[in-house]
């Protein structure tokens, strides 16, 4: 029958409490070191404890504790690759169209919550402060955007990325670049059965105009130069395991797509645009999913 085991590990998920009983689905790639003579417990050591909570990603066997390694508004780092490939593999375990259906259902639920909140404000019948009027206008704008585009509001994904890591999101936009990325690491190919994925760079229409503020350091100067401009579109990146039949790849594309994927991070990347003698840097939400819908 089942035997009690003791695992010694250097890393545990930060959301799991210490020094108290828990009931959590966990696992580890561990080394068996022996049996405790006094208790008969099996003894193991491992680098980290994997956590599979009752959530879509947890059900798809992604170690949710790896989301804690992600740093938003920074380039993709080596420490994040395990989370990246586990999320990619998790997307591959879904049925065709499953992520789109689930994301749409979540979108309907979120729209209902926003609608309920909007009605609460209207039903109160109280004089609105300036902040309340702004909140009401934002709610109305986001609801209108969700209903017309069947996609999640985009601006919060950039303003508050820490709220969305690991969440299922649906976006609609235009793919302007699609490249096939080959995975060179043999261990990754063997463990996950993945030898490539597609990076889709797309532009998404925003729910409202946004002031984009960037900074750069001029050549020979120490102080950063602040730059501002009003934008109505924003880039996003979608990493997919496959493409629809016949979908083109390369640069200078104008392909209408819908994507449903897990929000990995708001990542920083270099663009083809030059500022002085350096490539300009931008940040954009990165989603990971099974395949885009080509409209």
Which role does the model predict for each range below?
Residues 1-295:
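OB-fold and OB-like single-stranded nucleic-acid-recognition modules
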């Amino acid at each position: 029958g089942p035997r009690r085991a003791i695992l010694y590990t250097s890393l545990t998920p930060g959301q799991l409490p210490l020094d108290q009983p828990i009931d959590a689905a966990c696992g580890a790639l561990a080394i068996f070191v022996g049996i405790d003579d006094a208790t008969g417990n099996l003894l193991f050591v491992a680098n980290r404890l994997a956590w599979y909570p009752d959530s879509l990603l947890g059900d798809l066997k992604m170690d949710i504790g790896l989301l804690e390694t992600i740093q938003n508004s920074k380039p993709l780092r080596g420490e994040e690759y395990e989370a990246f490939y586990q999320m990619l593999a998790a997307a591959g375990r879904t049925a065709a169209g499953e992520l789109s259906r689930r994301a749409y259902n979540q979108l309907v639920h979120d729209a209902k919550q926003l609608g309920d909140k909007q009605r609460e404000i209207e039903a109160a019948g109280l004089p609105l402060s300036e902040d309340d009027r702004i909140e009401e206008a934002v709610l109305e704008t986001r609801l209108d955007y969700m209903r017309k585009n069947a996609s999640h509001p985009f601006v919060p994904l950039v303003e508050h990325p820490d709220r969305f890591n690991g969440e299922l999101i649906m976006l609609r936009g235009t793919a302007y670049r699609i490249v096939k990325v080959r995975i060179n690491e043999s261990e990754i190919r063997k463990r996950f059965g993945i030898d490539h994925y597609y990076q889709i760079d797309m532009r998404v229409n925003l729910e409202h105009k946004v002031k984009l503020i960037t900074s750069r350091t001029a050549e020979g100067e120490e102080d950063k130069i602040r730059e501002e401009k009003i934008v109505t579109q924003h880039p996003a990146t979608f990493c997919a395991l496959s493409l629809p039949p016949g979908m083109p790849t390369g640069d200078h594309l104008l392909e209408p797509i819908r994507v449903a994927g897990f929000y990995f991070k708001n990542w920083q990347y270099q663009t083809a645009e030059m500022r002085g003698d350096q490539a300009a840097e931008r940040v954009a939400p990165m989603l990971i999913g099974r395949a885009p819908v080509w409209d």
